[in-house]
A protein has these predicted regions:
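Extreme N-terminal "head/tail" segments of very large remodeling/mechanoenzyme assemblies
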Residues: 1-149, 157
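Cytochrome P450
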Residues: 161-164
């Protein structure tokens, strides 16, 4: 599984819609994401894990905490991920549960968590959050725990790797 494009909106420190073209990094399979503390590096991992599994990459972040506190209340919170698996491109869009302005009148309303997985062939999309997580797990053969241990080396785990 190789991430191609990641789009995040009102997610973590990213207040506005931000697109990261991961495919431009090449096909070597190992990427190093560096930057200053608080620059949003871990959020990139969180967004990929959230798109695939509905949970952040670390155990200390609940889905309800993923909405950006810097975002305009009207900006929707979502993550989209295009990824390549066995020569086929899949698309996932997922949003956490969060409060948003009502469509009519004043006040806020709860935006329920939602997800959709689109296949590269003529299969119908999977449209329920739990079903998307199940379909992703079956497709790539890794659950969230396995994925975060194998595909990502999150902040704080680097020293564990060095001394193992």
């Amino acid at each position: 599984m190789r991430p191609i494009k990641l789009t995040i909106s009102a997610f973590g420190p990213y207040a506005k819609e931000t697109e990261i073209i991961l495919d431009e990094l090449g096909e070597r399979g190992l990427y190093l994401i560096t930057g200053d503390t608080g620059a949003g590096k871990t959020t990139i991992f969180d967004a990929i894990a959230f798109a695939l599994y509905g949970e952040a990459s670390g155990n200390e972040r609940e889905p309800g905490m993923l909405r950006s506190k810097y975002a305009d209340p009207k900006t929707p919170t979502f993550v989209e991920l295009d990824f390549l698996y066995q020569g086929q491109i899949y698309h996932i869009r997922r949003n956490p549960e969060y409060m948003r302005p009502k469509d009519r009148g004043e006040g806020m309303t709860l935006q329920r968590a939602d997800a959709v997985l689109e296949f590269p062939d003529d299969r119908l999309p999977v449209t329920k959050a739990k079903e998307v997580t199940k379909a992703v797990t079956e497709l790539i053969g890794l659950d969230r725990g396995q994925f975060t241990q194998i595909a990502m080396l999150a902040q704080g785990d680097f020293m564990k790797l060095l001394f193992s």
